[in-house]
Amino acid sequence: MSIPLYEVLILASILFAMGLACVVAWRANVIMMLIGIEIMLNAVMLTFVGGSAHWGIAEGQVFSLMIMALTSAEVSLALAMVAYLHRRKQSVDTDDFSSMKG
């Protein structure tokens, strides 16, 4: 039994909207922005996998693996910057990133 594509797209749209709302609502907090971006990328991965299953091709799953690799690199770099900023400023606000040099 397979889930219809429109249900996958509806779920992905809801996830993307939740991630976008998270990014827009908590623009001052870097960690919440990262969580919102991760939710949006998971919605994109769900769309790729759903389309891949619907049309019977493997490219969507390959793109999902590429997105997973991209997000792991993004999270590791972003969390390193957040840890550095927290050590220097005792804060994780986005306004404090303007003081970083490099």
From Swiss-Prot:
| GO BP field | ATP synthesis coupled electron transport
E.C. numbers: 7.1.1.-
Any one GO CC term of the record: plasma membrane
Q: What's in the keyword line of the UniProt record?
A: Cell inner membrane, Cell membrane, Membrane, NAD, Quinone, Translocase, Transmembrane, Transmembrane helix, Transport, Ubiquinone
UniProt signal peptide: none
Is Ion transport among the key words of this record? no
Reaction(s) catalysed by this chain's protein: a quinone + NADH + 5 H(+)(in) = a quinol + NAD(+) + 4 H(+)(out)
Keyword Transferase included in the entry's annotation: no
The record's principal subcellular location, in a coarse class, is membrane
* Transmembrane annotation, as ranges: 5-25, 30-50, 62-82
Q: How does it sit in the membrane?
A: Multi-pass membrane protein
Q: Subcellular localization, per the record?
A: Cell inner membrane
Q: Which GO terms describe its molecular function?
A: NADH:ubiquinone reductase (non-electrogenic) activity; quinone binding
Member of which family? Belongs to the complex I subunit 4L family.
Explain the purpose of this protein.
Answer: NDH-1 shuttles electrons from NADH, via FMN and iron-sulfur (Fe-S) centers, to quinones in the respiratory chain. The immediate electron acceptor for the enzyme in this species is believed to be ubiquinone. Couples the redox reaction to proton translocation (for every two electrons transferred, four hydrogen ions are translocated across the cytoplasmic membrane), and thus conserves the redox energy in a proton gradient.
Instruction: Describe the protein's quaternary organization and the partners it interacts with.
Output: NDH-1 is composed of 14 different subunits. Subunits NuoA, H, J, K, L, M, N constitute the membrane sector of the complex.
Provide the protein name: NADH-quinone oxidoreductase subunit K 1
